[in-house]
């Protein structure tokens, strides 16, 4: 994977390695994911949906795994969630019906993050990797955890219409 530094000069941003190219046009399989609001969400249903996948959020107390900053695209999950939070009304205004964050972390872990970050939308847990495996999402491992590489899916009526891997700064949002 080609890499380049960004941010304060010590973070590594991934470049498109083609590992998400197969997703455009794909129909989402019917898989129930537990949401932080207690519901079960099936991404194959519903209208215009945006799902941003992220590796993990760090706990309020504690830090990232050792070497986290050297992993391309790993740093910035909290900022990414806050960016979607800050643009939530704007996204609804252009027709987005559903917005979700997605990680392989447990629902309990995600609940703490959703509350702490004041997210107006639920986070989805794929701790069993059912959706990740079905869609062949790019994954990586660190300290015994299997994590999703950062990406954003724009889904319309269960079909992936657009995939983006570039969303690293609070001012950047995937184009609708």
Which residue ranges define each predicted feature?
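Chalcogenol-based redox active-site neighborhoods
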Residues: 1-176
